[in-house]
């Protein structure tokens, strides 16, 4: 039943569909948002075939199940097999029906949690949470609210020590961005009001500015404009 659920989602190719029958929308508006690296919506119309192989299905904590899948393709020119990603998705029975759950949503139930002002922190087990960083982030949150003329935003903040740990909160056991040269990284997801930090810090003003710009003008800005505003108010990321 779980395998069929995942296979049907992959086969249909409807990525980030707000009416998807496969996902739970109980706590996330776009539960499959972080699966952009798989390219769900293009799997069936690429110039090459992508093989999806389920390599593990097992029960985890709090009534959830985990499904691990590899996505790979054959390079026609070199004859080499390329591993694209190894993904982790979760499932849970809700109202007598299994639905897919994002990795981030599942990890909310098992990660260390701290509420600091308007921010819900979810802490990767390899990261040591520092309350002073979180308080500084909340102060910046209040400052940005005044700057943009809105109420302080309430959002989730996943904090990990590096990009490798962070990618696993997105739902990847493997993806090439886990191994970027700096070992750090992060991103703001405005539709789910979530910041993912792989810079070993609970203070990430640059990404918070992105949440505010998206909140005030709810659409994707041009990259240069969005990054320019975030850098102006929140400083550069250095990675």
Predicted features and spans:
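Post-HExxH zinc-binding segment in Zn-dependent metallohydrolases
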Residues: 51, 220-239
């Amino acid at each position: 039943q779980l395998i069929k659920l995942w296979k049907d989602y992959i086969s249909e190719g409807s990525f980030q569909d707000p009416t998807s029958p496969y996902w739970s929308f109980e706590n996330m508006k776009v539960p499959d948002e972080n699966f952009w690296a798989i390219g769900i919506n293009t799997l069936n119309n690429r110039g090459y075939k992508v093989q999806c192989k389920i390599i593990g299905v097992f029960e985890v904590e709090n009534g959830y199940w985990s499904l691990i899948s590899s996505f790979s393709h054959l390079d026609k020119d070199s004859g080499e097999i390329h591993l694209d990603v190894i993904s982790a998705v979760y499932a849970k029975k809700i109202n007598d029906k299994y639905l897919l759950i994002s990795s981030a949503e599942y990890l909310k139930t098992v990660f260390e949690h701290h509420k600091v002002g308007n921010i819900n922190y979810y802490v990767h087990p390899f990261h040591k949470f520092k309350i002073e960083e979180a308080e500084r982030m909340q102060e910046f949150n209040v400052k940005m609210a005044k700057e943009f003329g809105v109420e302080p935003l309430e959002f989730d903040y996943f904090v990990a020590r590096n990009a490798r740990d962070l990618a696993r909160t997105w739902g990847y056991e493997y993806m090439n961005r886990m191994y970027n040269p700096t070992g750090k990284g992060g991103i703001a997801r405005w539709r789910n009001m979530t910041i993912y930090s792989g810079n070993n810090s609970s203070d990430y003003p640059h990404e918070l500015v992105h949440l505010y710009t998206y909140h005030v003008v709810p659409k994707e800005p041009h990259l240069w404009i969005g990054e320019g505003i975030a850098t102006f108010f929140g400083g550069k990321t250095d990675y």
